[in-house]
Amino acid sequence: MSPQTETKASVGFKAGVKDYKLTYYTPDYETKDTDILAAFRVTPQXXVPPEEAG
């Protein structure tokens, strides 16, 4: 049997849904030479609003 480890849920991540505009978009952000641009296409399931799928 493997040894058990204790996990602390409150460290590093707080569960919950936050509005996209409040957490990811920063209008005054200045790009750096080391920044990487990645794009993904998301297709929402039926009855899911497109802004919620992404």
Swiss-Prot record:
Subcellular location: Plastid, Chloroplast
Catalytically driven reaction(s): 2 (2R)-3-phosphoglycerate + 2 H(+) = D-ribulose 1,5-bisphosphate + CO2 + H2O; D-ribulose 1,5-bisphosphate + O2 = 2-phosphoglycolate + (2R)-3-phosphoglycerate + 2 H(+)
Signal peptide (residue range): none
Top-rank taxon: Eukaryota
E.C. number: 4.1.1.39
Prosegment location in residue numbers: 1-2
GO MF entry, a single one: monooxygenase activity
N-acetylproline: modified positions: P3
Main localization category: plastid
GO cellular component: chloroplast
GO annotation (BP), single: photorespiration
Alphabetically ordered keywords of this record: Acetylation, Calvin cycle, Carbon dioxide fixation, Chloroplast, Lyase, Methylation, Monooxygenase, Oxidoreductase, Photorespiration, Photosynthesis, Plastid
PANTHER family: RIBULOSE BISPHOSPHATE CARBOXYLASE, RIBULOSE BISPHOSPHATE CARBOXYLASE LARGE CHAIN
Assembly, per entry: Heterohexadecamer of 8 large chains and 8 small chains.
Miscellaneous comment as given in the Swiss-Prot or TrEMBL entry: The basic functional RuBisCO is composed of a large chain homodimer in a 'head-to-tail' conformation. In form I RuBisCO this homodimer is arranged in a barrel-like tetramer with the small subunits forming a tetrameric 'cap' on each end of the 'barrel'.
Function, as annotated: RuBisCO catalyzes two reactions: the carboxylation of D-ribulose 1,5-bisphosphate, the primary event in carbon dioxide fixation, as well as the oxidative fragmentation of the pentose substrate in the photorespiration process. Both reactions occur simultaneously and in competition at the same active site.
Protein name: Ribulose bisphosphate carboxylase large chain
